[in-house]
């Protein structure tokens, strides 16, 4: 009562007079000592307060979070650790206080852990610090290292700063040093849970891809007494090492792997969710997801097997289905649509329809967001992306998805328009109908009498299924409003077409060459200019890290090049007296600006 009445001097005096003499093991002793620590803090005696809070934290689990916070509040970060450690009476107290410093640090705590082990090998906080240090290095080193490995689907979004490579190099040294230290502790016979340290040493070695050392540490850990949690961690670490050290994931290895996946799936079923900050957390569920979408999927990607890579990501989706903290419930389907070419889709379909799937394959098929229905529909779409309309028609005829597209894919407008137009309210077509019309136009383009108009209509169809086109839905399932005017680095053939309109430009040129009417040829050339404008690379924020001055400079240069279309000089010179030129001049501000500057 005196403490909460702000009678801090009374609290200190009464503790020293009465409570300090108490010799019982009652929880009241550490509770009252914490009150004295708080009173010391309130009266400006921070170092003494920090010392008492660390004593109370080590002595009892009662109000431990409160005592941890009290210690943190009492520490002046401008002072050195030794200013506080000097208050401790013995090595055990110094180890306990050092542990509290380490618990609040986001920096490398290995030096502190080494000192704690030297001072008091039996420190119970050391086990917590081991797990925490592993978690920190997973964030600083392992996560960015995994992002450098192509394939799979990382969970949520990631962000990296320009210093990540130097941070990673430094962190890799920390991981290796930590692994060696943990092995020494595990082998020391001075700790009560040596298996935890030895297994953690193995996991740290795994993070740096030192699988030989990881296997040695795992073999040592297996001989030690292990708690059930450490046994589970041993099994997971061993599984990770086994998957990654394998030269190739083949059918025999898949059969060997299946029981481990089923074991984790059973763990998920048995695990009770823990509420943490309003979220329902299930660690085993997250472990399963990460194993499939970030570990096994990447191994298949490394082998060029995008079909099984997609199925691994889809299997992870299925495990996370319905989870309130899992937004990406169709990652497998997104991967299918954004990464597989038609040859990969054919392989995936053959896999899904095989008469004699292995047990591993049957398991993947049974629990997956990627289904045969999705694959069939996308197979047709993938062939449209590659302009193979005959094969697209075959696949669309197999598909149960007959979704209507309510915009005209052959609309001929001089400006880019994504939304449905007023005169299209009753319009309806399908992907199948589009592919059939394009195939018919292909044949008509071979005849001199119909070549020019057929090439032109095909070019319209090709342009309208780009990012800028009227019916992008023919080839995509989602359209961001902030893409365009650049082709993604390492983009697929489809992405280059979708953002660059190269094939459309080629066919407008074919139409112009085949045509004889000057007004028609003017229209073809203007549409070529439209396509060429999309091929001027717009600077992207991601290309400049933090060099915004260079970004601004390149952005200005981009706009100058964007406006000075490479085809405008020819268009003005050769077709300036046509009726279409007047129409284009009235419609296109870039053309007007170009003419005015001449």
Question: Where does each model-flagged region fall?
Answer:
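Extracytoplasmic/secretory-pathway proteins
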Residues: 1-598
